[in-house]
Regions:
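Catalytic pocket-lining loop regions of alpha/beta-barrel enzymes
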Residues: 3-6, 130-131, 141-252
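Histidine-centered divalent metal-coordination motifs
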Residues: 26-32, 165, 197
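Active-site gating/metal-coordination segments in enzymes
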Residues: 4, 74-176, 225
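Short aromatic-enriched loop/helix-cap "lid" or pocket-rim segments at secondary-structure transitions
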Residues: 33-38, 89, 120-121, 175-176, ...
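Conserved, mostly hydrophobic/aromatic
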Residues: 26, 95, 124, 132, ...
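Mid-to-C-terminal alpha-helical segments outside catalytic/metal-binding sites
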Residues: 1-25, 34-66, 70-71, 75, ...
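Short, well-ordered alpha-helical microsegments
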Residues: 92, 116-118, 181, 202-206, ...
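Short active-site segment of divalent metal-dependent hydrolases/proteases
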Residues: 29-30, 168, 200, 259
Length: 296
């Protein structure tokens, strides 16, 4: 298949693969004020960013939804996350309202280690939330926190996938790396997890978790893009394992739209450029995320 050179080429890319579109497991939508504050954070190369990060798709919410539709993204998560206690339940309510307005959006919740977390996670699932986002870096918390144990159990029991930013990229902070989240999986081996950014930069350790636990997946967010490779190249020795994981349905397309400093098409270019073939791309860009997110 020919890699898309521009965003206008994206539909031809998935069309040539014989797919009905794309499913993106790592897209951000959040209340406008929170999105503005996230963008402001990216404007200042702060401690968790570490470099210049000019966001390409800094547009009103409606325009961002229309852009995804134009790309042919048939379903996408709407990832959001709290940075302090007392935020998560309100974010979950907003996410359900957003998904009710935008049929392509998979209703996405979040959590924070605080009293009552298991109860509001359970309630969110009852209300229709179909995926969760946990950002260990921004949240700055330990996934092994005792308050979270019951919540992880609820998620595992309900087979609701959790997209987890658990790697130490772009800047190591708090309880990142494979060990803390690996300890959660030891306690809850049935948890359906999607490790964001292929677990960068601790690829090896997170690949090992995916190879050990049958419900652990990885998303491709920013991986192999020029921007990401400048921060630390993917180890070539791991490419065969990435190919195998993708072929076995454990790698999901993720992009970080809209918070990316390059066109959407560049992520697809980067994946096509791996040379793993069309069947691998079909699995990553549609079949695996469709299964994990229960869409398509």
């Amino acid at each position: 298949v020919t890699a898309p050179l521009t965003d206008e080429d994206v539909p031809a890319f998935w069309g040539a693969l014989g797919l009905p579109g794309l499913i993106d497991a790592h897209v951000h939508f959040m209340p406008p004020r929170l999105m503005e504050s996230v963008w402001a954070y990216f404007d200042e190369p702060g401690p968790l960013i570490g470099r210049h990060w000019p966001i390409v798709y800094r547009e009103p919410e409606d325009a961002r939804v229309e852009r995804l539709r134009a790309f042919g993204v048939r379903a996408f998560t709407a990832l959001l996350y709290p940075h302090r206690p007392g935020m998560a339940a309100g974010l979950n309510a907003w996410a359900l309202e957003f998904a009710a307005r935008v049929p392509e959006a998979v209703p996405t919740g979040t959590l924070f280690p605080e009293p009552g977390v298991a109860a509001y996670v359970e309630r969110a699932i009852e209300d229709g939330v179909r995926a969760f986002k946990v950002h260990l870096q921004v949240g700055g918390f330990d996934p092994r926190a005792p308050e979270l144990d019951a919540a992880w159990g609820v998620l595992a029991e309900a087979a609701v996938p959790v997209v987890v930013h658990a790697g130490s990229g772009p800047v190591a902070h708090g309880f990142t790396g494979p060990e803390p989240f690996g300890a959660v999986l030891t306690r809850h081996p049935g948890l359906t997890a999607v490790v964001a950014h292929l677990g960068a930069p601790e690829y090896d350790g997170f690949f090992a978790l995916a190879e050990t636990y049958s419900r652990v997946h990885l998303d491709t967010t920013m991986a192999f893009t020029r921007f990401f490779e400048e921060m630390g190249a993917f180890p070539p020795a791991l490419l065969p394992r990435l190919r195998d994981l993708g072929e076995s349905g454990r790698v999901l397309l993720g992009t970080d739209f809209p918070n990316i400093p390059y066109p959407y098409a560049h992520q697809l270019q980067a994946l096509a450029g791996l040379g793993f073939g069309d069947a691998w791309l079909r699995e990553v860009c549609w079949h695996a995320p469709a299964r994990v997110l229960g869409v398509g």
